[in-house]
Amino acid sequence: MARICHGFGMTVLAYDQYRNPALDGIVRYVELDELLRTADLISLHCPLTAETHHIINADTIKMIRDNAILVNTSRGGLIDTNALIDALRARKFAGVGLDVYEDEDGQVFEDFSDDVLQNEVVPILMSFPNVVVTSHQAFFTRTALQSIAITTMENARAFARGEKLVNEVKG
């Protein structure tokens, strides 16, 4: 995502506990509050841990500049859904894209076309004209799926050998 945005001439700000040397010259690392205050587009790309749970909440939403775009393709629990809905009702965001959402268990990978949705959040989110909700489709490209398979096998092999896991999520 950073490379794509950089390719379009965007200034790419990043907040991360661990700097990625592969992104040197592409992103400028800043503190979270600076990113929230200055970014026109905020795209979440992090695991769900105790530290990142509700990283976007009522307080952080207040820091986000008006008419920003918020995208979450990582984990639903990164965003406090009730705070997001309140912000959408207040017309805080120009747009929101959600490939994941809080409490989505049992709602994705199944066809509920002929059923009544039990999760009330999805219809509320979809009622906003500036919100797009997809069901874990953002990452389904041939290249991405191949990368997932290779990474999974490499991690399984390293685990079986007692080696350090390169993709271990700490936290």
Language-model-detected regions and their locations in the chain:
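Rossmann-like dinucleotide-binding domain for NAD(H)/NADP(H)
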Residues: 67, 77-171
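Rossmann-like dinucleotide/phosphate-binding beta-alpha-beta segment
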Residues: 1-66
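Conserved catalytic cysteine-centered active-site region
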Residues: 74
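Glycine-rich nucleotide-phosphate-binding loops and adjacent flexible coil segments
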Residues: 71
